[in-house]
């Protein structure tokens, strides 16, 4: 296996949590384990295919755990792994920056921010 080279450490971070949806998924999982259908309901714009792909990548990188119950119909939950919890301060900082940005751009962020437990 060829060892990958990075120019700066943030490249490694973005390789794991970069993209449009991964941080959103992780923010939702900081509020507890979720089923795929719950995550889809919380992010109605994401396609099922993209959600599944992002969850698989986060699981492969050790950021989330997939908990599968052996029953019919199958029951699967996702939760942050211990390693994933190490991203909590980063996620909190991203949310705080987003609040500041929305206020700067729109004045009243409530006019553009959907109601959610994450936005309280």
Region spans (language model):
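C-terminal regulatory/oligomerization modules of transcriptional regulators
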Residues: 1-5, 60, 65, 82-120
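N-terminal helix-turn-helix DNA-binding core of bacterial DNA-binding proteins
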Residues: 5-50, 71-77
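Alpha-helical interaction segments
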Residues: 10-11, 67-69, 86-87
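The DNA-recognition helices of helix-turn-helix-type DNA-binding domains
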Residues: 32-33, 46, 58, 98-101
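Residues within the DNA-recognition helix of helix-turn-helix
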Residues: 54
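Beta-hairpin "wing" of winged helix-turn-helix
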Residues: 59-79
């Amino acid at each position: 296996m060829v060892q990958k080279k990075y120019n700066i450490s943030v490249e490694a971070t973005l390789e794991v949590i970069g993209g449009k949806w991964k941080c959103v998924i992780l923010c939702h999982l900081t509020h507890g384990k979720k089923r795929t259908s719950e995550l889809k309901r919380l992010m109605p714009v994401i396609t099922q295919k993209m959600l599944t792909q992002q969850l698989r990548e986060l699981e492969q990188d050790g950021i989330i755990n997939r908990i599968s119950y052996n029953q019919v119909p199958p029951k699967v939950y996702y939760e942050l792994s211990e390693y994933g919890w190490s991203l909590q301060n980063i996620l909190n900082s991203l949310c705080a920056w987003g609040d500041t940005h929305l206020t700067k751009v729109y004045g009243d962020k409530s006019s553009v921010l959907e109601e959610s437990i994450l936005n309280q």
